[in-house]
Amino acid sequence: MASTISAYKEKMKELSVLSLICSCFYTQPHPNTVYQYGDMEVKQLDKRASGQSFEVILKSPSDLSPESPMLSSPPKKKDTSLEELQKRLEAAEERRKTQEAQVLKQLAERREHEREVLHKALEENNNFSRQAEEKLNYKMELSKEIREAHLAALRERLREKELHAAEVRRNKEQREEMSG
């Protein structure tokens, strides 16, 4: 079953390449052309401006004859040498160290940025507090001066009233002495 699936995948890759090559050489397809590929049968349905359409028919595993050759597995990779493996390991280790250094650098930059932001926020807070305190002190001084000026004005009026009352009393006493 697994070999059938892998064969199907390979044939689908080959089919698209084959179709491209055939369409280059034969611009007019043969009507009802059927292609046989091992355990697959491919029928060309129609050709459109947008592309071609095909019908792919897979034969069941029971229909496959034992005489049909098994499709070869993909070529094996060549054995890698110890030196090559060592180079790969060293390169991987170097990439890991570089990535780790980059992460540490980013963390350090982020911490430095956080410190700068915190320092700036504290500085702005201190400036705001100092300005608010200066403004409050100014208002208190102004209020104190206004209050003292108001009290001085009240004292002055009171003194003037007392002087006027004393003058009125004197005038009254003088009239009483003259009349009496």
Curated annotation (Swiss-Prot):
Keywords: Cell projection, Coiled coil, Cytoplasm, Golgi apparatus, Lipoprotein, Palmitate, Phosphoprotein
GO process annotations (BP): blastocyst hatching; cytoplasmic microtubule organization; microtubule depolymerization; negative regulation of neuron projection development; negative regulation of Rac protein signal transduction; nervous system development; neuron projection development; regulation of cytoskeleton organization
Pfam families registered for this protein in UniProt: Stathmin
Superkingdom, taxonomy of origin: Eukaryota
Modified residues (Phosphoserine): 50, 60, 65, 68, 72-73, 81
Region of interest (Disordered), residue spans: 59-82
ATP-binding found in the keyword field: no
GO molecular function, a single term: tubulin binding
Reported modifications of this chain: N-terminal palmitoylation promotes specific anchoring to the cytosolic leaflet of Golgi membranes and subsequent vesicular trafficking along dendrites and axons. Neuronal Stathmins are substrates for palmitoyltransferases ZDHHC3, ZDHHC7 and ZDHHC15.
Quaternary structure and partners: Interacts with STAT3. Interacts with CLU (secreted form); this interaction may act as an important modulator during neuronal differentiation.
Role of this protein: Exhibits microtubule-destabilizing activity, which is antagonized by STAT3.
Record protein name field: Stathmin-3
Organism classification: Eukaryota, Metazoa, Chordata, Craniata, Vertebrata
